[in-house]
Curated annotation (Swiss-Prot):
It is found in: Cytoplasm; Nucleus. Its main location: cytoplasm. The modification N-acetylalanine is found at A2. Its EC number is 2.3.2.27. Residues 132-223 form a coiled coil. Zn(2+) binds at C96, H99, C118, H124. A zinc finger (B box-type) spans 91-132. One of its GO terms (molecular function) is zinc ion binding. Can form homodimers and homotrimers. In addition to lower-order dimerization, also exhibits a higher-order multimerization and both low- and high-order multimerizations are essential for its restriction activity. Interacts with BTBD1 and BTBD2. Interacts with PSMC4, PSMC5, PSMD7 and HSPA8/HSC70. Interacts (via B30.2/SPRY domain) with HSPA1A/B. Interacts with PSMC2, MAP3K7/TAK1, TAB2 and TAB3. Interacts with SQSTM1. Interacts with TRIM6 and TRIM34. Interacts with ULK1 (phosphorylated form), GABARAP, GABARAPL1, GABARAPL2, MAP1LC3A, MAP1LC3C and BECN1. The B box-type zinc finger domain and the coiled-coil domain contribute to the higher and low order multimerization respectively which is essential for restriction activity. The coiled coil domain is important for higher order multimerization by promoting the initial dimerization. The B30.2/SPRY domain acts as a capsid recognition domain. Polymorphisms in this domain explain the observed species-specific differences among orthologs. This is Tripartite motif-containing protein 5. It is an enzyme of class 2 (transferase). Residues 186-199 are annotated as: Required for interaction with GABARAP and for autophagy.
Length: 494
């Protein structure tokens, strides 16, 4: 009877998950108790498959913070273990619960130990039985193999658990990176839209000022016209109400003046002639921005190098150049349009740099070969600015005239057989929707191309030279022209 009660108590304090006595028991809100390690492992599995924590027995949900240690059950388990380790209880374990005889035999069919009375019972009649000492080593070896197998499975299970955790961490990193990229892409979109909105509003304000200015002038003209008509009407009324002498005095002149009166209609502005707003092409803008981002990967550290005497001043850090007016009494004549070069020289690879030309009314920049190789002392102005003379440049003149300089091809050039000729360059007008404050220059030496980007306008291509023939090392080229505001080399972080 005591063993039956002991069995009932043992059943009450057995973990439903591992089927062993409770270890550090924790109780759920529903009242069921489990080993701390068992319910923790079950919590991970439950979250993985169901997305919430639930009791393994009744499936009622619970919160992990509501798990509470059950000290009462822990005390019962501790005392139960003490009782089970007592000699008299261990003796009861070694004896048959049904017959009270010592358990000395092993039934192969049932896989259990029995006493000699059990062997003779109808239940075990015809079964193969052996002394426990005879089969102990055999099953010890089997259990040892099973133990090694389970240990290996435990390692595999732990590895699988670690793999899942690693995959989970990897996914978290990947998702976070995707979030960062998405936020960056949409920020670029918002920046582009903000820039386009600002430009459209500025253009609209300019249009408004222009139209209203002309309408105000037209209104003033109409006021003067109305006043002139009123003066003539007053003169006619005075003559009609006066004497005959007043009526007929210079009457022919008055009639001729009236006949010449022609009302001028005010100037109007038709809506059809207005600039029509069109939503920006975001796909094209993103493609342009992507191209700019791609070439910016080849950002080169360029510094300005003083050349032959010129009308330019370079800053101490070699990042800025500006025009300086010549001193009148100097006898040395210097051709300012040669500008200055950037260092180092370029003989291969891809190179990119940006130049700040904010608020300048004139500038020229691009790429050229050594000034000593290109300088033609008999040429003045911009006639040297031609690819055949070793210049691949674009520029601004008079604050709004953007242009690129291409080689001119004249018959006399062919007859001369020389790279340096007196024929002026071919001027290619460049039309800007947004005037560039920053210009990006990208040189691909192997591809023989030089591209200019309007960084202010999200990287739209300004102009591109193709099939460039680089027979010498080439250099970045900068010419502030006669505008005293500086040209500044930009850093990648600016």
């Amino acid at each position: 009877m005591a063993s039956g009660i002991l069995g009932s108590i043992k059943e009450e304090v057995t973990c439903p998950i591992c089927l062993e006595l409770l270890t550090e028991p924790l109780s759920l809100d529903c009242g069921h108790s489990f080993c701390q390690a068992c319910i923790t492992a079950n919590h991970k599995e439950s979250m993985l498959h169901q997305g919430e924590r639930s009791c393994p027995l009744c499936r009622l949900p619970y919160q992990s913070e509501n798990l509470r240690p059950n000290r009462h059950l822990a005390s019962i388990v501790e005392r139960l273990r003490e009782v089970m380790l007592r000699p008299e209880e261990r003796q009861n374990v070694d004896h048959c619960a049904r017959h009270g005889e010592k358990l000395l035999l092993f039934c192969e069919q049932d896989g259990n130990i029995i006493c000699w009375l059990c062997e003779r019972s109808q239940e075990h009649r015809g079964h193969n039985t052996f002394l426990v000492e005879e089969v102990a080593q055999k099953y010890r070896e089997k259990l040892q193999v099973a133990l090694e197998t389970m240990r290996q499975k435990q390692q595999d299970a732990e590895k699988l658990e670690a793999d899942v955790r690693q995959e989970q961490a990897s996914w978290k990193i990947q998702i976070q990176n995707d979030k960062t990229n998405i936020m960056a892409e949409f920020k670029q979109l918002r920046d582009i839209l903000d820039c386009e909105e600002s430009n459209e509003l500025q253009n609209l304000e300019k249009e408004e000022k222009n139209i209203l200015k002309r309408l105000v002038q037209s209104e003033n003209d109409m006021v003067l016209q109305t006043q002139s008509v009123r003066v003539l009407i007053s003169d006619l009324e005075r003559r009609l109400q006066g004497s005959v002498v007043e009526l007929l005095q210079d009457v022919d002149g008055v009639i001729k003046r009236i006949e010449k009166v022609t009302l001028q209609k005010p100037k109007t502005f038709l809506n059809e002639k207005r600039r029509v707003f069109r939503a920006p092409d975001l796909k094209r803008m993103l493609q342009v921005l992507k191209e700019l981002t791609e070439v910016q990967r080849y950002w080169a550290h360029v510094t300005l190098v003083p050349s032959h005497p010129s009308y330019t001043i370079i800053s101490e850090d070699g990042r800025q150049v500006r025009y300086q007016k010549p001193i009148r009494h100097l006898l040395v004549k210097v051709q300012y349009f040669y500008g200055v070069l950037g260092s180092p020289s370029i003989t291969s690879g891809k190179h990119y740099w940006e130049v700040d030309v904010s608020n300048k009314r004139a500038w020229t920049l691009g790429v050229c070969v050594s000034l000593k190789c290109t300088a033609n002392q008999s040429v003045s102005g911009t006639e040297n600015y031609q690819p055949k003379n070793g210049y691949w440049v674009i520029g601004l003149r008079n604050a709004g005239n953007y242009r690129a300089f291409q080689s001119s091809f004249e018959f006399r050039d062919f007859l001369a057989g020389s790279r340096l000729t007196l024929s002026p360059p071919l001027i290619v007008p460049l039309f800007m929707t947004i005037c560039p404050n920053r210009v990006g220059v990208f040189l691909d030496y192997e591809a023989r191309t030089i591209s200019f980007f309007n960084v202010t306008s999200n990287g739209f291509l300004i102009y591109k030279f193709s099939d460039c023939h680089f027979s010498y090392p080439v250099f970045p080229y900068f010419n502030p022209m006669t505008c005293e505001l500086p040209m500044t080399l930009c850093s990648p972080s600016s």
